[in-house]
Regions:
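Beta-sandwich/jelly-roll carbohydrate-recognition scaffolds of carbohydrate-active enzymes
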Residues: 2-152
Length: 153
């Protein structure tokens, strides 16, 4: 299973063999976060949601896009319309916000399972007082009901 932190996105398709069904991220790197947001997109043909962190981070490019819905008419560049953000989530423990800006990321891993269409994440944060908290999430865009996206945290 390829670890994308160790590879460039150039030639990624060639690196993922036919037997490989997931891509992984083994640590959080703020400089590569937007690239991973693109790679960890979940979608079902009707809508797609970028693979941003649930709690957000500085510089993120969040977005949920609907197939066939565009902004612009008779203009040179037609853009996809950004639908409402259904991922935005604030996680607090004892009044301290858990995110990559406020806490130290002790462990972080994500995997996009292509076979099941699920994005999985596990992050361990250390807050400024040294307490450790593990955050896990799953998300998907349903093929059974293409209007449905779901997230479990």
């Amino acid at each position: 299973m390829p670890d994308l932190n160790e590879r460039s996105s150039v030639g990624l398709r060639d690196e993922l063999g036919a037997a490989e069904w997931q891509i992984t991220e083994s640590c959080f790197d703020a400089e590569k976060a937007n690239t991973f947001e693109t790679l960890f997109t979940v979608g079902n043909g009707r809508l797609g949601t970028r693979g941003t962190l649930e709690e957000g981070h500085v510089g993120e490019v969040s977005g949920t896009f609907l197939s066939g819905v565009y902004d612009g008419y008779r203009v040179p560049v037609i853009d996809l319309v950004n639908a409402p953000d259904w991922l935005s989530l604030g996680v607090f423990v004892n009044g301290v916000r858990l995110d990559v800006q406020s806490c130290t990321v002790v462990e972080h891993e994500r995997a996009l399972d292509f076979r099941h269409g699920v994005l999985w994440r596990r992050t361990v944060f250390a807050d400024p007082e040294g307490r450790r908290t593990q955050l896990e999430s799953l998300r998907f865009a349903s093929f059974a009901d293409r209007r449905l996206c779901a997230m479990r945290v």
